[in-house]
Amino acid sequence: MERRVFGKSLVGGAVAAGIAAGLSTEQAVPQAARTLKPKKNLEMHVGGDYHSIAGGPGADMTAKSNLEYNLRHGVKHLTAQVRKLGPDGAWDADELKRMKDNCDKAGMNFEAIRMDADYIMLRPGSERDRRLEAIIGNIQKASQVGVKVVTHHWTVIPIRRNARQDGRGGVTYAAFKLEENWKDLPVGTAGKVSSDDYWERITTFLHAVIPVCKQYDVRMAAHPYDPPGLPFGYQGAENWDSPSIFEGYKKYEAIVDSPYNGFQLCLGTTAEGLRNPATEVIPIVQYLAGRGKVHQIHMRNIKGGLNNFAEVYPDEGEMDFLKIMRILRDSPFNMSICPDHMPTHSEDPGRLQAYAFGYGYIKALIHAVNSEV
């Protein structure tokens, strides 16, 4: 508790002042905030999710085959999507109970649910109001089956990739390079969304939803838009994590400063918005994890950085995940660390092999950092 108060009063103010003074993100985070006392963290764990499903995309995530696939690779915590939806995106309570029962029978913890991004597409009006009411109801239903986290990825334009690169062992890496003619790209289906419009939607969402999350003990975890740092106006959007991913995180969590308002901290996405991911990602993780605002980790590595990158295996990119895992170990973080966006291969079309590697890599990192203390 004392650490969180310290983070709010001193770290937040110092970081804001440092950034305003033109310091780098690393310079702006006080040394005290970068020196958490080493301690074992036996609560953080590897997690499985919707990126890799035995049976293929769209298959039942709580079917015996998928649960056993995860359990075989040491995964005991699941983030699932709800396929059966009612009006305005309402989750079916019976479907949630079925998923929970399947997980319980298999020895799997039904830890989190990824909700859709439909809300963020909507302008103020009755349709958006109905969607918010459905989300509030979904939080209550999630609580009833013991789910602790609801994740979401606000995408007024789709995730952007426009290139492929060859990788080790014949795999293919998804990649992105900012187009020279990006101003000529078509506007997304949501139409033009200004920064003010975007933040109005986020603010309305957080003020309506976070008090309900607190009431039902369900944490809301926002995934940064992928990729961050796109120039304003890219496909008509002025994304919340542009032009600065770090500033976006701080602004987002400050709207409703609550332990229930946090992030699905995608390390790969965060790195995509940085010129020097190896060094610049560290103070971001320190800041968010030290404040208890990380409710899930996506552990993905990249080669490159801002506006020019490729998604690679976790052991070959710009970031040193051992350093990041030490920060998580010493912080209040106690949720899932999930592999994310693994490379593809013709002999592994569902990427089950690739994600199995990711699960083992994460488990080894957790063991390694806890063995140090």
Where are these predicted regions, by residue range?
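Histidine-acidic metal/acid-base catalytic patches
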Residues: 2-43, 122, 146-148, 203-207, ...
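Boundary/entry segment of secreted carbohydrate-active catalytic domains
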Residues: 34-62
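A generic structural signal for short
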Residues: 47-49, 54-55, 87-88, 126-127, ...
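Active-site-proximal loop/turn and secondary-structure-junction residues that shape catalytic pockets
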Residues: 50-54, 84, 116-119, 154-158, ...
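Short, acidic/polar
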Residues: 54-70, 132-139, 280-287
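Long, His/Glu/Asp-enriched segments that create or flank divalent metal/ion-associated functional microenvironments
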Residues: 78
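Structural motif corresponding to the early beta-alpha repeats
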Residues: 81-203, 207, 214-215, 269, ...
